[in-house]
Amino acid sequence: MIRIGTRGSLLATTQAAIVRDALIANGHAAELVTISTLGDRSSAPIETLGVGVFTTALREAIEDGRVDAAVHSHKDLPTAQDPRFTIAAIPPRQDPRDAVVARDGLVLGELPVGSLVGTSSPRRAAQFRALGLGLEIRPLRGNLDTRLNRVSNGDLDAIVVARAGLARLGRLDDVTETLEPVQMLPAPAQGALAIECRAGDSRLATVLAELDDADTRAAVTAERALLAELEAGCSAPVGAIAEVVESIDEEGRVFEELSLRGCVAALDGSDVIRASGIGTSGRARELGLAVAAELFELGARELMWGEGNSPQGS
C-alpha cells in the first residue's frame, strides 16, 4: 500500500486523489493520508509565513515514515533542492493561466475604476497594477470556496485565482475571463503537481515515475530554474511560463523546442521587465538560467530590490 500524504483542503485532497486513482489504475494499491500544514492553519499573508509553508509538514511526514510519498502543488515547493527527497513524477499539467471570477459575469475591461479585486499574490497584484485599469487590490486568503464566496456575497468585485484549481474542483463555470500570458504571466510551475518521495526509495520512485509527463517536467524545470536564479523565493513578483512547441526546420521537418517567457514586476506596477528564450527539453534548466540572465541584464535585480519591493515579497 502506497500511503500518499496530502494537505487537508478540498483542492489538495482532490489533486492527491487524482494521483491515487492513477496509481490504482496502474495496478498499485494506494491511499491518502491527510497532514496538517502551517499554511492551512494560519490566516496570515503567505509571504509572512516563510518558504515551504505548505510543504514542510508533508516532507516531515515522508521523512518520519507516516507517508511514503506526498503530492504538492509544484509552485509551493521551495526552489532549493532538498537532498532528502526526490520529485519522482510530475504528471500532465493543468492549464497554467490565471483566471478572473467577477461579479455579473464581467471581464477585466468592464470593471469600473476603483473596483475591488482580491489577491494575496504579489505577482498577480504587481502585474494587475501594471495593466493600468485603476482597480484596487485587496488581500485574499482561505480555501477556494471562501474566495469565490467573497465575490458572490458582494465583498469583492472580482478575484484572481489559478484556473487549474477551479478546473480540478469542477468550478470553471465561475470563470468570467482567463488571462493570457501577455496580460499576466503565471507563477512558475502553476497548474503542475509534484509527487515526492524519499531520495533513497528507488523502488517507489520507479512506480511513481509511471505518472511522469516529460513535457510538463521540462516546462516546470525551466520555469523553476529561472525563479531560483532570481533568488526570489515563491512569493516574489516573478512570473514564468514554458511550453513545448513544434517548429519546422529549413527542410520542412517538424521538431520540438522549449519556449520560455519570464517577467519581474515592481510591486507597485510601475514597471514590468520581460524576457524570453528558446531551447530544448533536454536543456530546460539552462534555458531558465539564460532567460534569468537576460532579466538581470534588463534591470531585474534593481527592480526587485528597489523602492517598494523587498526580498520577501507568487
Swiss-Prot record:
GO terms for molecular function: hydroxymethylbilane synthase activity. Its cofactor is dipyrromethane. Keywords: Porphyrin biosynthesis, Transferase. GO terms for cellular component: cytoplasm. It catalyses: 4 porphobilinogen + H2O = hydroxymethylbilane + 4 NH4(+). The modification S-(dipyrrolylmethanemethyl)cysteine is found at C234. Binds 1 dipyrromethane group covalently. GO terms for biological process: protoporphyrinogen IX biosynthetic process. Pathway: Porphyrin-containing compound metabolism; protoporphyrin-IX biosynthesis; coproporphyrinogen-III from 5-aminolevulinate: step 2/4. PROSITE patterns: PORPHOBILINOGEN_DEAM. The keyword Transferase applies. Gene3D superfamilies: Periplasmic binding protein-like II (3.40.190.10), Porphobilinogen deaminase, C-terminal domain (3.30.160.40). Its EC number is 2.5.1.61. Tetrapolymerization of the monopyrrole PBG into the hydroxymethylbilane pre-uroporphyrinogen in several discrete steps. PANTHER family: PORPHOBILINOGEN DEAMINASE. Monomer. Belongs to the HMBS family. NCBIfam families: hemC (TIGR00212). The porphobilinogen subunits are added to the dipyrromethane group. This is Porphobilinogen deaminase. It comes from Mycobacterium ulcerans (strain Agy99).
